[in-house]
């Protein structure tokens, strides 16, 4: 069996985000590659980290008050050094990692979001958890642990879960952003151009935790995977049909990222 080791995107490896953001996001998202890159400012990254850390500590205050001081003493990228004090798998369901409305308003005020709005016009952020407000979810991926997402296309979830909410006359576009990350080593992996090859990239549906989950029906090691070299504050805007998944974290820090789905006018679909 052939093995394709993931490659680091050359432009991203050189830290070149300008070539991606100088032209419209949509040109690449619905173009040949299916994705594009950009960055937020250092002050915006600090603000975002503050929102996530506040919710992270509040959750720990609720489930493990006796250990909160130990978590408070470390940066989130060092979470793994004290994570054995809690039951990681039990205390971090997705519903506990959705930012509150106040943080969503803060993200919407950031320069990168204003750029998205200047191109796409009115944007709605998805509410996958049906909380009643827009959902931006953060993730913790500890070193050398199996808590990374498998290869999939987000569109598959709409196909296996008919009740998943879409918006009439609008199309979904995905945003993934590195909050704490080592460029090209523990971020996001993807298959360039796969959004146009639904004829060869198939999936099967499995029931996990009483929910239908789409699973790539093939060998991941045979995929031509690319790892864009995302530093903290870098983001990827990508097509909802693009194959992607988390990178195995072989570094010595915890990866923290956010992701969310925006809905834009269907006229942007090529």
Where are the regions that the model predicts?
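N-terminal auxiliary "cap/dimerization" subdomain that precedes the catalytic jelly-roll/cupin core
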Residues: 1-124
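A structural signal for short, well-ordered beta-strand segments and their strand-loop junctions
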Residues: 36-39, 126-137, 178, 187-191, ...
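Active-site rim elements
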Residues: 100-103, 221-224, 246-247
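Exposed beta-sheet edge/beta-hairpin loop segments within beta-rich domains
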Residues: 103-106, 229, 249
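Conserved double-stranded beta-helix
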Residues: 115-187
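Short, solvent-exposed loop/turn segments at secondary-structure junctions
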Residues: 143, 156, 180-184, 195-196, ...
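Double-stranded beta-helix
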Residues: 183-243
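Non-heme Fe(II)/2-oxoglutarate
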Residues: 235-237, 242-270
């Amino acid at each position: 069996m052939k093995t394709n080791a993931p490659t680091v995107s050359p432009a991203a490896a050189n830290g070149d985000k300008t070539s991606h953001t100088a032209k419209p996001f949509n040109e690449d998202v619905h173009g040949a590659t299916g994705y594009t890159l950009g960055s937020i400012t250092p002050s915006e990254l600090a603000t975002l980290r503050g929102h996530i850390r506040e919710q992270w500590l509040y959750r720990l205050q609720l489930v493990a008050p006796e250990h909160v001081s130990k978590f408070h003493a470390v940066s989130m990228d060092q979470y793994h050094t004290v994570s054995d004090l809690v039951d990681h798998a039990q205390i971090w369901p997705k519903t506990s990692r959705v930012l509150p409305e106040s943080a969503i308003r803060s993200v919407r005020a950031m320069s990168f979001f204003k750029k998205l709005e200047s191109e796409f016009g009115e944007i709605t952020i998805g509410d996958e958890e049906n909380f009643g407000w827009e959902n931006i979810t953060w993730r913790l991926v500890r070193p050398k642990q199996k808590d990374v997402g498998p290869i999939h296309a987000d569109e598959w979830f709409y196909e296996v879960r008919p009740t998943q909410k879409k918006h009439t006359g609008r199309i979904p576009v995905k945003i993934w952003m590195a909050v704490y990350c080592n460029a090209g080593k523990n971020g996001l992996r993807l298959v360039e151009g796969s959004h146009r090859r639904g004829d060869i990239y198939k999936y099967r549906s499995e029931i996990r935790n009483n929910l239908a989950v789409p699973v790539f029906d093939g060998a991941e090691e045979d995929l031509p995977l690319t790892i864009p070299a995302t530093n903290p504050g870098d983001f990827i805007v990508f097509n909802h049909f693009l194959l992607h998944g988390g990178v195995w974290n072989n570094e010595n820090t915890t990866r923290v990222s956010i992701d969310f789905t925006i809905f834009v006018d269907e006229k942007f679909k090529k």
